[in-house]
Amino acid sequence: MTNSPIRVLLQTTIPSIEDDWNIGRFSMMRDYLASLTNDDGSPLCLVTARDRAEPGRPDPILSTIDRSDFDELWLFAVDTGDGLHPEDCAAVGRFRSNGGGLLVTRDHMDLGSSVCSLGGIGRAHYFHSTNVDPDEANRVIDDRETSYILWPNYHSGANGDFQEIEVVGPPHPVLLDPAAPGGLIRYLPAHPHEGAVGAPVDDQTARVIATGTSKVSGRQFNLAVAFEPSADGGPGIAQSTFHHFADFNWDPAAGCPSFVDETPGTALAQSPEAQQSIRRYVRNVALWLAGREPFEDRKDHLDRQLDEALEESFPASDPPAVDSR
């Protein structure tokens, strides 16, 4: 595996507004990615974190990203519909067509709906007013604590708490964790009103890889959709909410915009296991989006599965080995 650093762009879809979800509110994840190293001690990632330029005109970085040296883009759609210019979308599309990795995340209702204009991974995001969930049964209010937020608004828990996730189908590389029980990532940050994602039915490269469960209704909902790399484009992930990566959700003491009024929890701060799970997910995503599938981790997981299968295959009546000395 090459030791050249992965060039990561973390970008929001709003200008640098202090009392909003600006890029500074994702600093813990930024610093964690920047702290990762290769076996030889060299940086695993070179991270650039920025907000977009003023809306209504092409962003100077996004609109030229296909001509940049970035390996992957993590796009935090925190706008109300005007966060991406057509030239931004076209360049991001070319970037992925050239093999670039792309993570796109948003939040509840229509927050981040500018991603619908991306096509591709943008089509995996369902909103209240545009690109609605094709399953009418999902077009219902879930969280009822914040009455002005309508569907999709899945309540996985309080900000500052964590949720237990369910891995769907064959475990995806981004969900492998050899240090965890079962070799899989089990936790992500919780949020009172997550958005909705789903695999486009006409895209054979896409599948749901993880689900969560509402603490209000008990409904299961999709947390992440993975798009496998193909001749048509690089790897991609559609994530149900940017709160999985926000400082406030990793540590509520980091603060939040003034319009957030739900009482946060403290469970994540008290669970090193959940913290490790979340960091591992971020690391795995960074590697996988850059085409560096964590092969060693996959081998560890397969070896673990083989060991468990061998143990189960031994007859229960076999006596234990005894030292006769």
Q: What are these regions, as identified by a protein language model?
A:
Residues 1-31, 69-74, 112-114, 120, ...:
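Extracellular ligand-binding/catalytic regions of CAZymes and related secreted enzymes
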